[in-house]
From Swiss-Prot:
The keyword Chaperone does not apply. It catalyses: Hydrolysis of (1->3)-beta-D-glucosidic linkages in (1->3)-beta-D-glucans. GO terms for cellular component: plasma membrane; plasmodesma; side of membrane; vacuole. It comes from the Eukaryota. This is Glucan endo-1,3-beta-glucosidase 5. It is found in: Cell membrane. GO terms for molecular function: glucan endo-1,3-beta-D-glucosidase activity. It is an enzyme of class 3 (hydrolase). One of its GO terms (biological process) is carbohydrate metabolic process. Glycans are attached at N102, N129, N260, N409. Disulfide bonds join C366-C428.
Amino acid sequence: MLFKGVFAVFFVITLLYASLLIEVEGIGVNWGSQARHPLPPATVVRLLRENGIQKVKLFEADSAILKALSRTGIQVMVGIPNDLLAPLAGSVAAAERWVSQNVSAHVSSNGVDIRYVAVGNEPFLKAFNGTFEGITLPALQNIQSAIIKAGLATQVKVTVPLNADVYQSASNLPSDGDFRPEIRDLMLNIVKFLSDNGAPFTINIYPFISLYNDPNFPVEFAFFDGTGTPINDNGRIYDNVLDANYDTLVWSLQKNGFGNLTIIVGEVGWPTDGDKNANLMYARRYNQGFMNRQKANKGTPMRPGAMDAYLFGLIDEDAKSIQPGNFERHWGIFYIDGQPKYQLSLGSGNGLIPAKDVHYLAKKWCILAPNANLQDPQLGPSVSYACDHADCTSLGYGSSCGNLNLAQNVSYAFNSYYQVSNQLDSACKFPGLSIVSTRDPSVGSCKFKIMIKSEDASEASAMMPITRSTAVLLLLSICLYIVL
């Protein structure tokens, strides 16, 4: 009897420990690096560890980031950008060099716990018009061969992060899911290759995008509160779009003979700015709802149990392309300086812990001069130039700074350029229009940011992408103001 009692206690403790492991290891984050003033990798790694995050997904093999992850115990999925698919598809030797330099070197010498290599990133998006369809599988095969040759096949698995538009359902019921007809054969070849090599299928699912693309999309169905109108699929009840989308993939795999293939959700999250539905309230509601499911070990009707998933993203990226929308720069659960945007429990019961030892530029801002003429013909071109070289995405309709008046809009644009230019005197010399102020011009929830110091700042500011869409909107508002 004593033995049975001890065994029972041991069994319960084992179960509790196992559930703790599920909680800790069940969530990862995407660590993107498209920022003009990025936090030092060591600072970000400390941020990860203090918040109990033990898995990261990288979009490229940044050597500084990988070195910072050395011997931390953090599991890593390292990415290969789409622009490298062609050379890797065309040469086994090129694939072997890439694996040697970006995987083997870090695993053996630096003790980086690389678990996956992500070959490409959403290469079959409809917007790419088939550009990568002929080279993704060959690149995947060559990288796998290189991993085998390096003796890492048992530790490192290949995968291809795909957008959820690679499958569909004519009836919108998950059970009618299958891969898109025009890429179905290609998808089945990739799925078979993944299955043959014990590798996972990685999918990115974004309920926010469903809402962004369709103004008639039922808002409540995007969240996990159970308040959306449910879908009944032959007795399987779906009250949120994530579950329905995920199980559409499960059915697509199952009906083609791959029902047991492991699935990773490579990206899941909600942006906080740049659109009327991208705000702090919705982002917290979505991400906390998702984390509560993970903590409760809740899955979908077809795949019970917590998902293997990576939140998108860790930190805002103010240099990302905004071709998909202004929200693209605002997916982080932390601002660009590593400060939490809202209270979010990742499983420990506590909120997010901010980054430590972050250094900022001086407390000064570039604003519209009080005596500036709002009808000055140089005003429009000056604003356009500032927003072409900085981030003005918070000024759009429904965004955090969307209610500013004309003068405040101009000041925001000037200051954005001034900050990304490291507060150089020359960056606040719009003739007759701008001055430097030591008084914070922030308006309500619209914050006029002070940029962080970064050792890569000068290099980053030299590579700023053009953001004309926001500049055009500002020009239109200026023209309307002048006309009226």
